[in-house]
């Protein structure tokens, strides 16, 4: 198990929010950060602090991406025409592991990364094992036949914990999903408020 995977709930505690809306999140029972000093009185946060927090929260939500992975995604978003904030979200939601998570083939975004890494998914009939693989509108993502009876898949498919995203069309019988289009920020079913505009300010400062 990777350090990023094992530390997933530390991200919740550090942010003081239940990032994925999971019943097991420690934030449901306490709202302070990890460590013995978690309950200290909060001081006023600077603009830079707010921007950094917004970046850390978005990085954490997508499986605690490395700074290199996240900054590269931001740079691509900035190069594209249009609103950089919206471009950033569209790129993050176009990741193969994000779509596997949105399709509810697995219970968590961390599990989605491992699931893809271990070769359990195809894109347009070809096996792809790169979590950051960028999907395009119309791409069909499917769980490989030999992987469909895995416990975590059956658990996720049966769960009502999360809603489906409108931009991912799912066929539960064949365990396939079509990436309809890259979404706008307002369409993404985040359990908490995300502020990509502050992320843009962070990198622009």
UniProtKB/Swiss-Prot annotation:
PROSITE patterns hit by this protein: RIBOSOMAL_S4, S4
Any Pfam family matching the protein: Ribosomal_S4
Molecular function per GO: rRNA binding; structural constituent of ribosome
GO CC annotation: small ribosomal subunit
SMART domains: Ribosomal_S4, S4
Keywords associated with the record: Ribonucleoprotein, Ribosomal protein, RNA-binding, rRNA-binding
Bilayer-spanning residue ranges: none
Segments forming domain S4 RNA-binding: 94-154
Disordered: annotated segments: 1-46
Matches recorded under Gene3D superfamilies: Ribosomal Protein S4 Delta 41, Chain A, domain 1 (1.10.1050.10), RNA-binding S4 domain (3.10.290.10)
InterPro entries (UniProt xref): Ribosomal_uS4, Ribosomal_uS4_bac-type, Ribosomal_uS4_CS, Ribosomal_uS4_N, S4_RNA-bd, S4_RNA-bd_sf
GO biological process entries: ribosomal small subunit biogenesis; translation
Keyword Endoplasmic reticulum: no
Keyword flag RNA-binding: yes
Function of the protein: One of the primary rRNA binding proteins, it binds directly to 16S rRNA where it nucleates assembly of the body of the 30S subunit.
Family statement drawn from the similarity comment of this UniProt entry: Belongs to the universal ribosomal protein uS4 family.
Subunit note: Part of the 30S ribosomal subunit. Contacts protein S5. The interaction surface between S4 and S5 is involved in control of translational fidelity.
Alphabetized HAMAP family for the sequence: Ribosomal_uS4_B (MF_01306_B)
Annotated protein name in UniProt: Small ribosomal subunit protein uS4
Species per Swiss-Prot/TrEMBL record: Caulobacter vibrioides (strain NA1000 / CB15N) (Caulobacter crescentus)
Lineage of origin: Bacteria, Pseudomonadati, Pseudomonadota, Alphaproteobacteria, Caulobacterales
Record gene name: rpsD
């Amino acid at each position: 198990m990777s350090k990023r995977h094992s530390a997933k709930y530390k991200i919740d505690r550090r942010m003081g929010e239940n990032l994925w809306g999971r019943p097991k999140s420690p934030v449901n029972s306490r709202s302070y950060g990890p460590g013995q000093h978690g309950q200290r009185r909060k001081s006023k946060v600077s603009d830079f602090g707010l921007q950094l927090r917004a970046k850390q929260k978005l990085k954490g939500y997508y499986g605690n991406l490395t700074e290199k992975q996240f900054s590269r995604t931001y740079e691509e978003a900035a190069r594209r025409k249009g609103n950089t904030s919206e471009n950033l979200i569209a790129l993050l939601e176009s990741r193969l592991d994000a779509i596997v998570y949105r399709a509810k083939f697995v219970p968590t975004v961390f599990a989605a990364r491992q699931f893809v890494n271990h070769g359990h998914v195809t894109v347009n009939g070809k096996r792809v094992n790169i979590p950051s693989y960028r999907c395009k509108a119309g791409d069909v993502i499917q769980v490989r036949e030999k992987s469909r009876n895995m416990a975590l898949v059956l658990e996720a498919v049966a769960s009502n914990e999360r809603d489906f995203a409108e931009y991912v069309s799912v066929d539960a019988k064949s365990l396939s999903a079509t990436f309809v289009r890259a979404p706008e920020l307002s369409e993404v079913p985040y359990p908490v408020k995300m502020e990509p505009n502050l992320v843009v300010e962070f990198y622009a400062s």
